[in-house]
Regions:
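A hydrophobic/aromatic-rich effector-binding and dimerization subdomain
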Residues: 1-21, 67-136, 153-164
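Short, conserved beta-strand element in jelly-roll/cupin
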Residues: 31-48, 64
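Regular secondary-structure segments
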Residues: 42, 124-138, 182, 186-189, ...
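Short acidic-glycine-tyrosine-enriched beta hairpin
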Residues: 52-66
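All-alpha amphipathic helical-bundle segments outside canonical DNA-binding/catalytic cores
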Residues: 134-151, 169-172
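Basic/polar phosphate-binding segments, predominantly the helix-turn-helix DNA-binding elements
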Residues: 180, 184-232, 238-239
Length: 240
């Protein structure tokens, strides 16, 4: 099955950290990586779509994106968008895991992809310490950097395990017709679904449907179809 999703970035190290701050907004297509991604939002607000689920983001949120997960950030120009992004090799996570601490599970999305952090300063402090260590060339830099990253990940995992952990809920369209269209698409993913067919099926103008769909979901119909088909194909591969 062909898709237009782009694999972005290559990770030659165990992990890399980026501390970015700008007001440029984002203009990034849906894409995926072969590594895990942690984003700590230190300033700003916007949206983030991960594996077909769209979330509202606010300052203090952590976004946890597993390897191969299709995602896209959505931030408007003019809003200060400060974030720390850490790319992490799945092999590194596996090597550092123990039977009772499987670090890759942090990114499996079972509870959700976005965690609202209460008192995020403690997590930010750990990230700042890691950033400072990576920028230097002091004795034991690699060992200490590895330890700081592991400490950060375990601190996040412990918060995720808290029974009152606040995971963001995906945004669900409220328009009943759009909900019906979403259900129809999911039930016919393996078929050709032209826009005209959807419009006829639901007795709605093609152009009105396209506008309403984007308004309610944040996707174009074509973009949603592509993402759902990619996720479906990935699930079939997992199942063998």
């Amino acid at each position: 099955m062909e898709t237009n999703y782009e694999k972005r970035g290559y990770l030659l190290d165990d992990f890399r950290l980026f501390h970015l701050k700008d007001k440029n907004g984002t203009n990034i297509d849906y894409h995926y990586h072969e590594f895990c991604k942690l984003l700590l939002l230190r300033s700003g607000y916007g949206g983030y779509t991960v594996d077909g689920q769209r979330y509202d983001l606010k300052t203090g949120d952590a976004v946890l994106i597993g390897s191969q997960c299709v995602h896209r950030p959505e931030f408007e120009p003019g809003v200060l968008y400060e974030r720390i992004i850490i790319y992490i090799s799945p092999q590194f996570l596996q090597q550092q895991s123990t039977p009772d601490c499987q670090l890759e599970e942090i990114f499996n999305g079972k509870k959700g992809a976005v965690l609202h952090l209460e008192n995020p300063e403690a997590i930010w402090t750990l990230a700042d310490s890691l950033e400072q260590e990576l920028e230097g060339n002091a004795y034991g830099r690699v060992i200490l950097s590895n330890g700081l990253l592991l400490r950060l990940l375990i601190a996040l995992a412990r918060r995720m395990q808290n029974p009152v952990a606040a995971f963001a809920k995906p945004i669900v369209p409220t328009n009943s017709r759009i909900l019906d269209i979403l259900h129809y698409i999911d039930a016919h993913l393996t078929e050709d679904i032209p826009i005209e067919r959807l419009a006829e099926e639901f007795f709605i103008s093609k152009y009105h449907m396209m506008r309403l769909f984007r308004q309610e979901t944040g996707y174009s119909i074509h973009g949603y179809l592509q993402e759902r088909r990619l996720l479906h194909a990935r699930e079939l591969i997992r199942q063998g």
